[in-house]
């Protein structure tokens, strides 16, 4: 009797599963594919991961390039504010919605993002560009710096190759080229510590082939404002602050597509922060000790036309963490040890401000300065389902001990599909070769391909040995 009941339950599960699959197939057949994409693109990345499990047809649709691009366009209309901070020796990552409606006493729920083991990181820089997070850090007990790119939606983690020469001080900036749809990393290494204006410029492009650093030139000399100098990428141009002859402050402009440098002279001020103001470059200026501030907006990049906005700062806190939203609001987060943690939005046009409490971070936000270490904030963060396609490359490396060239295979993460994401969280593994740590890679179909290639090579070697042995016997 129990056997019959178990069989009946199994048949019921099979029928239910087949019914669900048939229903999902019916929906795809009856509704136009563009309409289905439009509807599903309004869901969150977590909901998309669940929808991928409905059927093979749904999975195929949701990993297509058309859907990934449609989802990104929809995500741009619902930006989020990103928080990265260190609490009790561990790095925490949160994001919360940017409220689009005006009003006071608002509150939003924060979502925690998990990346892996990062307790021993000493973060040097952190940037958010087009849904990807770029981080540069030193591990505990190590002098050389590691650079990684992380997509919180897909959990794809890319470790960038080491710079040559190693163990030198450098600054890196993350940027996106909307024309070619490429991510790039610009790195400036201090060649001569006695001359801080002497830089070696290198660029790395992601998604087009092996991860390799290329040397480029800058036609003018300058000095970066400080090591914590943050850059901002707007419409394919990377901006960051520097000095000429230690007296003139400038904004360095790096065209991500052409990889050409230029600069704009600006007024010296105690606090200068670059912001994205309604898709245009904005310069936030505050004089030390004064509540009044200015925002200069570059309205015309070709003719160098600026517009000026005066305001009274409603919040004197993290001035260096000042950002702007797509609706033209300035953003200041409260001090990390403030309870409750909140964000202040100031509208320049209305000259009004509002406070939004951030919930869900109470147990992770520090309640004392002694437990707080490092804090990064970004506005206009979006969910991006893109997976960067990477490759593996054999790079010759000179072995100074034996004076011979060694072949080091640099392994990089290879996604299961070009647009696999969300629930396709891949397990990473570290590889060592030639005494150096190589980049992470996925354990999946790429490893199966490597096994297949090795078996094919072994079979070819056996055939070659058999042929040679046959010729020897004939002679």
Swiss-Prot record:
Residues 423-433 have a biased composition (Low complexity). Residues 25-71 form the F-box domain. This is Putative F-box protein At1g46840. Residues 423-475 are annotated as: Disordered. PANTHER family: BNAA05G37150D PROTEIN-RELATED (PTHR31111), F-BOX ASSOCIATED UBIQUITINATION EFFECTOR FAMILY PROTEIN-RELATED (PTHR31111:SF114). Disulfide bonds: none annotated. Residues 451-464 have a biased composition (Basic and acidic residues). Residues 465-475 have a biased composition (Basic residues). It comes from Arabidopsis thaliana (Mouse-ear cress). Pfam families: F-box (PF00646), FBA_3 (PF08268).
């Amino acid at each position: 009797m129990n056997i019959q009941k178990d069989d009946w339950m199994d048949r019921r599960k099979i029928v239910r599963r087949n019914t669900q699959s048939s229903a999902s197939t019916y929906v795809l057949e009856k509704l136009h594919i563009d309409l289905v994409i439009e509807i599903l693109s309004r869901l969150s990345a977590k909901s998309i991961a669940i929808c991928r499990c409905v059927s093979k047809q749904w999975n195929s649709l949701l990993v297509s390039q058309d859907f990934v691009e449609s989802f990104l366009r929809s995500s741009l209309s619902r930006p989020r504010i990103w928080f990265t901070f260190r609490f009790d020796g561990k790095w925490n990552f949160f994001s919360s919605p940017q409220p689009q409606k005006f009003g006071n006493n608002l509150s939003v729920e924060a979502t925690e993002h998990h990346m892996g083991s990062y307790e021993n990181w000493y973060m040097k820089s952190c940037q958010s560009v087009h849904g990807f997070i770029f981080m540069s850090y030193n591990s505990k007990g190590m002098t050389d710096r590691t650079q990684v790119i992380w997509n919180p939606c897909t959990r794809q983690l890319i470790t960038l190759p080491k710079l040559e020469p190693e163990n030198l001080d450098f600054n890196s900036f993350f940027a996106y080229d909307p024309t070619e749809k490429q991510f790039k990393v610009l790195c400036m290494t201090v060649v001569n510590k006695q001359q801080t204006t002497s830089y070696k410029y290198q660029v790395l492009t992601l998604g087009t082939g092996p991860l390799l650093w290329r040397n480029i030139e800058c036609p003018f000399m300058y000095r970066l404002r400080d090591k914590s100098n943050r850059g901002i990428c707007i419409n394919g141009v990377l901006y960051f602050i520097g000095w000429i002859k230690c007296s003139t402050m400038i904004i360095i402009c790096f065209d991500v597509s052409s990889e050409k440098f230029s600069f704009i002279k600006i007024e010296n001020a105690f606090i200068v922060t670059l912001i994205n103001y309604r898709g245009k470059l904005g310069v936030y200026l505050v004089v030390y000790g004064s509540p009044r501030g200015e925002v200069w907006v570059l309205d015309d990049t070709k003719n160098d036309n600026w517009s000026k906005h005066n305001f009274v700062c409603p919040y004197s806190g993290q001035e260096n963490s000042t950002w702007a939203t797509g609706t033209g609001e300035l953003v200041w987060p409260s001090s990390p040890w403030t309870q409750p943690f909140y964000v202040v939005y100031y509208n320049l046009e209305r000259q009004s401000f509002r406070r939004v409490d951030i919930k869900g971070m109470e147990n992770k936000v520090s309640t004392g300065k002694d437990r707080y270490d490092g804090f990064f904030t970004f506005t206009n963060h979006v969910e991006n389902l893109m997976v960067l396609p990477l490759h593996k490359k054999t790079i010759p490396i000179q072995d100074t001990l034996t004076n011979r060239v060694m072949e080091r295979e640099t392994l990089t993460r290879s996604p299961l599909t070009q647009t696999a994401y969300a629930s396709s969280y891949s397990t990473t593994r570290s590889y060592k070769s030639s005494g150096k740590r190589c980049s992470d890679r996925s354990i999946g179909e790429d490893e199966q391909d490597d096994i297949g290639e090795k078996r094919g090579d072994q079979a070819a070697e056996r055939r070659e040995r058999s042929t040679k042995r046959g010729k020897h016997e004939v002679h």
